[in-house]
């Protein structure tokens, strides 16, 4: 029997960025932090310039002749790159329809679990199909099922809005929720903002009584 192949369990070696002393080219074309061209200078001179400005020398184009480096704050640059990558990943997210199923006689604990599931789906940018399943004669209680779905929509209103109102679909009742694009401003918050605005409006000055000149004799 041939021996089983051995798998390397060691963590993969992370490729370190080509910055500062890791740059091994003797001549470099250097761009300053503000975009100004410093021309072709030696590696040592480029490192001295970066150190004097308390910045990093970063290799940005290794295939150029000579290689191109830029003087910058590498920590800030890396943070911005990671931020852009996250935003691009978020924009490329394909919206899916996730389903949350329940019975119209659901207890509070199970209802809270379904709410938590829906919140996670909505946070990920997915739509939620809320389904109430009927069995046998339970189909007679569509009004209770609709009440349950509208309660769920109310409990999720800060994160979602109704895309399709509750309706019958075969032996089920369904409702579609979609992630809310703009934050919900509740009625109480609107009233508080309006009251605050009224309080900040200065009161008009009170009219003063005109003085009547006394006749001179």
From Swiss-Prot:
Region listing for Disordered, in residue ranges: 178-217
SUPFAM superfamilies: Translation initiation factor IF3, C-terminal domain, Translation initiation factor IF3, N-terminal domain
Gene Ontology biological process terms from the UniProt entry: ribosome disassembly
Superkingdom to which the source organism belongs: Bacteria
Gene Ontology, cellular component aspect: cytosol; membrane
One function term, GO molecular function aspect: ribosome binding
Keywords, ordered alphabetically: Cytoplasm, Initiation factor, Protein biosynthesis
Described purpose of this protein according to its UniProt entry: IF-3 binds to the 30S ribosomal subunit and shifts the equilibrium between 70S ribosomes and their 50S and 30S subunits in favor of the free subunits, thus enhancing the availability of 30S subunits on which protein synthesis initiation begins.
Subunit structure, as described in the record: Monomer.
The protein's name: Translation initiation factor IF-3
Recorded name of the encoding gene: infC
